[in-house]
């Protein structure tokens, strides 16, 4: 997932993988945001597309994330939980900002935080989905 969302003031698309590697190499803690990629890594989008089309990249990412949802189902986990576990399992991620809208989503995130980190095999399988 590479959508930066509706942020319109960035003139060049950042390379999240390069930034992540630089932070890891330089021992810089990472604050993870958009762990569920504005809803793309959840079971369903909870909103309609904006008439201006400004959130089209988020909806495109949702379509591209179908293999991710299938993998979450195979592992008997919700897509949102798996996305948060992936973020929490990433080397040098110190915190994850949650984008929850209700207490049910908050509870799921808190439950996820108490789960074990993903093992290397699962992390590799997830990375292979989008490379």
Where are these regions (language model features)?
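Beta/alpha (TIM)-barrel catalytic core signal, keyed to glycine-rich beta->alpha loops juxtaposed to Asp/Glu
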Residues: 1-131
